[in-house]
């Protein structure tokens, strides 16, 4: 199990990926402690001096003008958590909950939230013990922060609600006891610090980014395989073409294709002197389309990495000045827009893959048997597999509709513009699953197409890609139950079977 020493504000994308993929052990770097303690001291001074500060000794939202008596401050924070735990939908899986918790810890440990070290350590203990609060997937509009999801997370700290421990749903109090942990009592501002933030939105979008990276790499490999299967030209990947345009994503994607389509290919040699002038766009324009997608992936990474290390609480405690200032860092508009742009990229990756599948079905375009099977008529081959890919590509076009342009006012119009970032991030998961299904069909089809070039082989890396599939899925000589083959290819893609053939591109 990996151990991550958390230096607040310095989480890397690879660390976040590890948190999502595997249980981890967290340690808080000692450099964070002074800042955490200073912010708590500032909050305590405000309470002791009788000053009014939002979220410390006032109500919330439209009730911000209501002053709360000192003796009610602890109850105020507990009531906040209980009342805001109003999410609905299926529980998030352990990986997503773990990622949200780590993001929350990272933000709180920056020392702007006025939350005690002991509460942050209690959150770290949940992660390290594998106690995962039950967090429903739906119920946040991404401003004022992800209130409902983070309230459900916080319930477990209080010994309320449910949590998963060693794969079993238990009352939170029981889960804590089995893990050797104790509930905490919240002090002034701590409930608000736990609930305010963009951590759920950011985690949702990060998962979309992680899956998009795998899909991108897999699609590049399958695009190269299809190029070989239909005897496509390698000249469109010439570095001079892409340097003339100057789009970095395009330049880098063309380089990836040259890496995969090396000169040592019997298929390439077989049609080196053919008279075909130009390939269809789905082959020839792969660097341009996939390059644009890569640019979106890189921009999304930049935004999400900044947000993963951000302080998105409100109000913020500036201990050096003894001030607590209300702002709007909880508004997840940057995350929503990044997720919307990523959705476009995921949709286009799948759409281009589907067009290449369709190209292979057409005997006039591919110079292969119709639907990639001999004895057509008796056999339908890949006919309906391409229909499945088309259905998935069409679904993605609808799912790619932007969420960040939507807004509904909440909290009696006090919170009158919201980001819808959680929904923007969450739909990426469905889009990724759809696109993975499309690419799986292309992988199956392209390998079948190369098989049908009897006696000819592709480049060494692409032969690895074909061999990986053929170890699990046999060549099609006649029709058979098709769905299990798509499922197998999809599972291999999710495991990174093709991603490992592509050099780092992010």
From Swiss-Prot:
Catalytic activity entry: L-histidine = trans-urocanate + NH4(+)
Covalent link location (5-imidazolinone (Ala-Gly)): 143-145
Post-translational modification note: Contains an active site 4-methylidene-imidazol-5-one (MIO), which is formed autocatalytically by cyclization and dehydration of residues Ala-Ser-Gly.
Sorted UniProt keywords: Cytoplasm, Histidine metabolism, Lyase
Pathway: Amino-acid degradation; L-histidine degradation into L-glutamate; N-formimidoyl-L-glutamate from L-histidine: step 1/3
Cellular component GO terms held in the UniProt record: cytoplasm
Protein known as: Histidine ammonia-lyase
């Amino acid at each position: 199990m990996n151990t991550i020493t958390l230096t607040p504000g310095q989480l890397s994308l690879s660390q976040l990926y590890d948190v999502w993929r595997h249980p981890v052990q967290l340690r808080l770097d000692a450099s964070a402690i002074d800042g955490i303690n200073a912010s708590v001291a500032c909050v305590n001074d405000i309470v002791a001096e009788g000053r009014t500060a939002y979220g410390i000794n006032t109500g919330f939202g439209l009730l911000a003008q209501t002053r709360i008596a000192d003796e009610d401050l602890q109850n105020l924070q507990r009531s906040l958590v209980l009342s805001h735990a109003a999410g609905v939908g299926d529980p998030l899986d352990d990986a997503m909950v773990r990622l949200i918790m780590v993001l929350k810890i990272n933000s709180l440990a920056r020392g702007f939230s006025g939350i005690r070290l002991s509460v942050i350590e209690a959150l770290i203990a949940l992660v390290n013990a594998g106690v995962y609060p039950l967090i429903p997937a739906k119920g946040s509009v991404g401003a004022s922060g992800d209130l409902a999801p983070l309230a459900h997370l916080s319930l477990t700290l209080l010994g309320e609600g449910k949590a998963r421990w060693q794969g079993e749903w238990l009352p939170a109090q029981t889960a804590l006891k089995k893990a050797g942990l104790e509930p905490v009592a919240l002090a002034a501002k701590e409930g608000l610090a736990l609930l305010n933030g963009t951590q759920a939105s950011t985690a949702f979008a990060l998962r979309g980014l992680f899956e998009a990276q795998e899909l991108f790499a897999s699609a590049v490999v399958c695009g190269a395989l299809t190029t070989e299967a239909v005897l496509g030209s390698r000249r469109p990947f010439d570095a001079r073409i892409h340097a003339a345009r100057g789009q970095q994503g395009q330049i880098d994607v063309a380089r990836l294709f040259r890496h995969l389509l090396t000169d040592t290919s019997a298929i390439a040699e077989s049609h080196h002197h053919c008279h075909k002038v130009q390939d269809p766009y789905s082959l020839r324009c792969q660097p341009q389309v996939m390059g644009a997608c890569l640019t979106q992936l890189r921009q999304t990474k930049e935004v999400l990495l900044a947000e993963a290390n951000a302080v998105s609480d409100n109000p913020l405690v500036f201990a050096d000045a003894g001030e607590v200032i209300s702002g709007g860092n909880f508004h997840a508009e940057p995350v929503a827009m990044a997720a919307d742009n990523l959705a476009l990229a995921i949709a286009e990756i799948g759409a281009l893959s589907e067009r290449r599948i369709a190209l292979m079905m057409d005997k006039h375009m591919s110079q292969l048997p119709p639907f990639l099977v001999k004895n057509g008529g008796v056999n339908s081959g890949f006919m309906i597999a391409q229909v499945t890919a088309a259905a998935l590509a069409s679904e993605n076009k609808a799912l790619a509709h932007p969420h960040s342009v939507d807004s509904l006012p909440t909290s009696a119009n006090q919170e009158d513009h919201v980001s819808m970032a959680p929904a923007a991030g969450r739909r990426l998961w469905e889009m990724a699953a759809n696109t993975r299904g499309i690419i799986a069909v292309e992988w199956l089809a392209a390998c079948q197409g190369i098989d049908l070039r009897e006696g000819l082989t592709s480049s060494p890396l692409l032969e690895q890609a074909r061999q990986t599939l053929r170890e699990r899925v046999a060549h099609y000589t006649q029709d058979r139950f098709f769905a299990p083959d798509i499922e197998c290819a999809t599972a291999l893609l999710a495991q990174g079977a093709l991603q490992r053939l592509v050099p780092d591109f992010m």
